[in-house]
Amino acid sequence: MKFQKLGNTDIDVSVVALGTWGLGGGSVWTDKDSTVEDAKRLLDVCHEYGVNYIDTAPVYGTGVSEELLGKALKGRREDFILQTKCSLNWRNEGGNFHYERDGYTVNNDTRAAAVKKDVEDSLRRMGTDYLDSIIVHYVCGSFPVEETVGALEDLVREGKIRTYGLSNSQPADLAAYQEAGGRISVVQEFFSILSPFHGREYFELCKKYNTVFQTYGVLEEGFLTSPV
């Protein structure tokens, strides 16, 4: 397995990461409910092949993915680089409506208090006292970038996160976060040979800021694994 630094940090991550959307269960995350044993087997395979980068999010199964990972990581937390997300929550404490699913209303809130509460909730669900990386799940233009950056920097100083990034964003968002004093280590965007999106523009900005461009959907949900 090849490794690289996560942006400007000293964090070594495998160039392949494990996304744990499928652990969430429910109506959309996968076709079955996962167990702790499923999560443990995933981590075993990752370890076997040298994958140390694990990605999840609070809304994957409305907390389920994080909880299963937390239990599966007991006794082996230091073997993996753990990345989760903030901004999407189901606490009904404000923010912008994002979606309704499985009886929950999910809002998008990038204000300081919401970001910090998201991190505290993730730490609790996963049974750890720090996160290696936290990603703003959906960049939101309704709230000041400076406020979000300030909250993320506070969390770094407090030792609760090591670094942070963006997802579902535009190249202009990366520039705005950097100009607001942010230190964006990673951007996570949908990208494939069928859906190049704004990859080229993002690639140039990532080079400028030494930010890792992390992709999801590269196999188009399995379509690109079949003969053409």
Which residue stretches match the model-derived regions?
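Active-site groove signature of glycoside hydrolases
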Residues: L123-S142
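Beta/alpha (TIM)-barrel catalytic core signal, keyed to glycine-rich beta->alpha loops juxtaposed to Asp/Glu
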Residues: F3, V139-V228
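A short, structured active-site edge motif that brings together acidic residues
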Residues: D79-R91
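N-terminal binding-site loop/beta-alpha segment at the start of enzyme catalytic domains
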Residues: M1-I81
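Glycine-rich, positively charged active-site loop/lid region within alpha/beta enzyme cores that binds
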Residues: D12-S14, G22-V28, N92-Y104, L205-V228
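Conserved, mostly hydrophobic/aromatic
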Residues: L6, L18, C46, I54, ...
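Short, acidic/polar
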Residues: K32-C46, N108-M126, Q170-A175
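A structural motif
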Residues: V51, T128-L131, I161, I184
